[in-house]
A protein has these predicted regions:
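Surface-exposed, beta-sheet-biased, low-hydrophobicity segments with strongly acidic/polar composition
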Residues: 4-176
Length: 176
């Protein structure tokens, strides 16, 4: 990604949210439909076995009374440090930065989703070239759930992901 290859600083990026729909991985009628999201590359992923691949960050799953994001690290064979932070008291639009406290991120269990809820996802670590050195760092994305359809087993959310290495800001450098 260009933001990680520029030794002079972060690249401008578009902070316009994209809308994403995912279906629960737990329902057989959804086989072949995207149930996971790759925040790093900002794309949906069809995952038939959550232990089979690591090219995604969260998967949608059924939990008692609703749907949830499950971070990749909650599955024993994947072992990533993807984390989900539940944000309270701040709207999606007003959330300007991801939490710094590592303890704010849930890495090992499902995070129930609510319509209007705001979340931050810390992606899996990936190679990032900065100042001629390669490091493995996450990206950060903010999410707000706009629709949950329990009968269909689907969730719709808006997401903004900062493409720059380990940058917690949700404000593009152009807007600073």
């Amino acid at each position: 990604m260009a933001g990680c290859d520029d030794p002079l600083g972060p690249q401008p990026w578009n902070e316009t949210p994209i809308e994403v729909q995912l279906w629960s991985i737990d329902r057989t009628e959804h086989i072949g439909l995207p149930s996971a999201f790759d925040f790093f590359n900002r794309q949906r992923v069809a995952v038939e076995d959550p232990n089979s691949a690591s090219g995604w960050d969260v998967v949608v799953s059924d939990v008692e009374g609703g749907l949830a994001f499950v971070p990749a690290g909650a599955f024993p064979d994947i072992g990533t440090d993807v984390g989900i932070a539940v944000i309270t008291g701040v709207s999606f639009d007003d959330l300007l930065e991801a939490p710094r406290d590592a303890d704010a991120y849930i890495t090992d269990r499902a995070v129930p989703l609510v319509e209007g809820g705001v979340y931050v996802v810390r992606t899996r670590r990936a190679a990032c070239a900065t100042f001629g050195f390669s490091t493995f760092t996450p990206r950060y994305g903010k999410v707000t759930v706009t629709e949950i359809d329990l009968e269909e087993g689907s969730v719709v959310f808006k997401v903004v992901v900062n493409p720059n290495c380990n940058d917690r800001s949700f404000v593009s450098p152009e807007d600073d």
